[in-house]
Amino acid sequence: MNIAVVGLSHKTAPVEVREKLSIQEAKLEEALTHLRGYPHIEEVAIISTCNRLEIYAVVSDTEKGVVEITQFLSETGHLPLNYLRRYLFTLLHQDAVRHLLRVAAGLESLVLGEGQILAQVKTTHKLGQKYKGIGRLLDRLFKQAITAGKRVRSETNIGTGAVSISSAAVELAQTKAEDLANRRISIIGAGKMARLLVQHLLSKGATDITIVNRSHHRAQELAAQFPQASLNLQLLPEMMQVVASSHIVFTSTAATEPILHRENLTAALDPNHALMLFDISVPRNVASDVHGMEGIESYNVDDLKAVVAQNYESRRQMAQEAEGLLEEEVEAFDLWWRSLETVPTISCLRTKVETIREQELEKALSRLGTEFAEKHQEVIEALTRGIVNKILHEPMVQLRAQQDIEARKRCLESLKMLFDLEIEEQFG
């Protein structure tokens, strides 16, 4: 078995491609079941965020497993394979392991060191278990990645003052609008991103903020976290009325189709009304046909890169410190993974030795006579089992502890030959 990751991110694909491959949580079980149905995929987990879609898999055949994942992505996004491949990356074995640890640590994020991705990795692990996508290998890998992410944040300063997608969007809005305190601002959506938007808008002096959401209860929960802000709450049917009266609109919903487009904006807006749209959703909430509309400035997540770049240089040194910690975690996982190669051989050897012990014990007890056997069987049983365990213990400990891959393979081959073991290979 080997580990592979196939995916795309803000580094390899623009938002118009990423949004086609975004997998919402409601569709995750179906996607995992579909992937597990391929003949060469044994375990699978999916990280889907606004900046990345990555599929981690344990594959019985590396090349065929990667082809199956690529085929799945092509079908999911309704994208031709030749077109899709130019945006995909594929990492195998230790490179795949290292990549996930870097993702969890925030080193692969658009916003270097941002903390939200660690929560998303935890969610991927939890849902992968719930929907039976994750097995022994990916369970251990994701736990190692979560440990790595926590270590990087606790043992380095990379997370201190890190901007997020939401804070970068607010920063960009302030740059474009100059004074947020005198602007009517609306946020469409009431999830985690919306909460962060409110938090950063308030810190920049915004005072007139309206939340528009499908669920009034969800909007109330958000408003309750900022009692001092007196947030205005509106339901989705009033969305266009709110947009028409706003100077700045942020969109952060889980809608799979655009909710703002040329048609409804043209109908709702006064011809002389100036509006700024900041769309931090993937799939996009603002349609591409909005670009070029008179009086409207529209920005999406890919437009945040300039804001993030200002923050990047000061964080690069901290990222280098984090790399050393990640290598320790990569090595820890690699040692565990490689030790699994010994499991079939050790198990087979123990089974064979135990069979011999039981056979020889039965012969000895029959020669000793029924009365003696019944009286002393437990003692003799414990004696023989103790001898076997003592003989096998030290070689097995040394075998598991052997870090040199080639040396371990030679030891395994020697055991197979010397004891004539017939083993079905489980890990390659």
From Swiss-Prot:
Domain of life assignment: Bacteria
Catalytic reactions of this protein: (S)-4-amino-5-oxopentanoate + tRNA(Glu) + NADP(+) = L-glutamyl-tRNA(Glu) + NADPH + H(+)
Binding site for substrate: T49, C50, N51, R52, S109, E114, G115, Q116, Q120
Statement: the UniProt record of this protein carries the keyword Cell membrane: no
Record-annotated disulphide pairs: none
Active site location: C50
NADP in keyword set: yes
GO MF annotation: an example: glutamyl-tRNA reductase activity
Function statement: Catalyzes the NADPH-dependent reduction of glutamyl-tRNA(Glu) to glutamate 1-semialdehyde (GSA).
UniProt-listed PANTHER family: GLUTAMYL-TRNA REDUCTASE 1, CHLOROPLASTIC
Note: During catalysis, the active site Cys acts as a nucleophile attacking the alpha-carbonyl group of tRNA-bound glutamate with the formation of a thioester intermediate between enzyme and glutamate, and the concomitant release of tRNA(Glu). The thioester intermediate is finally reduced by direct hydride transfer from NADPH, to form the product GSA.
Protein's name in the database: Glutamyl-tRNA reductase
